[in-house]
């Protein structure tokens, strides 16, 4: 097997990535496959942190738009990410991988509080760390949480696993002429409003020079291929590096 290209990564997954073909919840087959691939990468010596969204269980923004208090809705969304984190922890432990779920909101009987130094120590010991409950603050997405945690723990790159193999100029499922980008700058993403992550997350990565790769997590073996450099998605980085 090829050697890993990174020492420490942060993998961002949407909650929807856990649904598979279902309309709601967690697909056992999907979460087992993801856990197997994460375990395979971990055994290569790569330190892995993850942030998972909660949209497969609850979408706070949707209910807020329908009239629910936004702060309450966002808190409910944070709890959904804890549920996903616990599910992934269980799947990883079935793979024989030590895993810790660390929450940005206190829920001590279920998982650890997020403490940066402790998280880094877990990673150094070879444990997979799942960061749950977003940033712990309303009005911030799990993409922003992923950017923040990647920077805090000193990840080499943030990998965003999606249902497409990169960033396109338009929705490739609707526009046959949509162009796939190999490389983008942070400013291009912001100026062209490309659907990589929300603007807050992109600006945070830009200001701290955290590289982003968007790739297709639904393709079996994709994570291992990305880590070993056999496959790439769309890279987002500073303009002076292109």
From Swiss-Prot:
Listed GO molecular functions?
A: ATP binding; UMP kinase activity
User: One GO CC annotation, please?
Assistant: cytosol
Keyword line = ATP-binding, Cytoplasm, Kinase, Nucleotide-binding, Pyrimidine biosynthesis, Transferase
Q: What EC number(s) does its UniProt record assign?
A: 2.7.4.22
Q: Which residues bind ATP?
A: 12-15, 55, 59, 162, 168, 171
Source organism's superkingdom? Bacteria
Note the Gene3D superfamilies from the entry. Acetylglutamate kinase-like
Instruction: List the InterPro entries hit by this protein, alphabetically.
Output: AceGlu_kinase-like_sf, Asp/Glu/Uridylate_kinase, Uridylate_kinase, Uridylate_kinase_bac
Name of this chain's protein: Uridylate kinase
């Amino acid at each position: 097997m090829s050697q890993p290209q990174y020492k420490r990564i942060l993998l961002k997954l949407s909650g929807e990535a856990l649904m598979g073909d279902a309309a709601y919840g967690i697909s056992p087959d999907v979460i087992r496959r993801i856990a197997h691939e994460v375990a395979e990468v971990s055994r290569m010596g790569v330190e892995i942190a993850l942030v998972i969204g909660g949209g497969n269980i609850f979408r706070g923004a949707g209910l807020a738009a329908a009239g629910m208090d936004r702060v309450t809705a966002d808190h409910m969304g944070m709890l959904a990410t804890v549920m996903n984190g616990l599910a992934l922890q269980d799947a990883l432990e079935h793979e024989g991988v030590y895993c810790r779920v660390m929450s940005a909101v206190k829920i001590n009987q279920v998982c650890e509080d997020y403490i940066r130094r402790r998280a880094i120590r877990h990673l150094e010991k070879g444990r997979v760390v799942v960061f749950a409950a977003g940033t712990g603050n309303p009005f911030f997405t799990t993409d922003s949480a992923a950017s923040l945690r990647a920077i805090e723990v000193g990840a080499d790159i943030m990998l965003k696993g999606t249902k497409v193999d990169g960033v396109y100029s338009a929705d490739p499922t609707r526009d046959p002429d949509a162009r796939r980008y190999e490389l983008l700058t942070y400013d291009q993403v912001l100026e062209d409003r490309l659907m990589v992550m929300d603007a807050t997350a992109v600006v945070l990565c830009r200001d701290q020079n955290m590289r982003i790769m968007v790739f297709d997590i639904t393709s079996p073996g994709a994570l291992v291929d990305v880590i070993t450099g056999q496959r790439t998605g769309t890279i987002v980085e500073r303009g002076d590096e292109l």
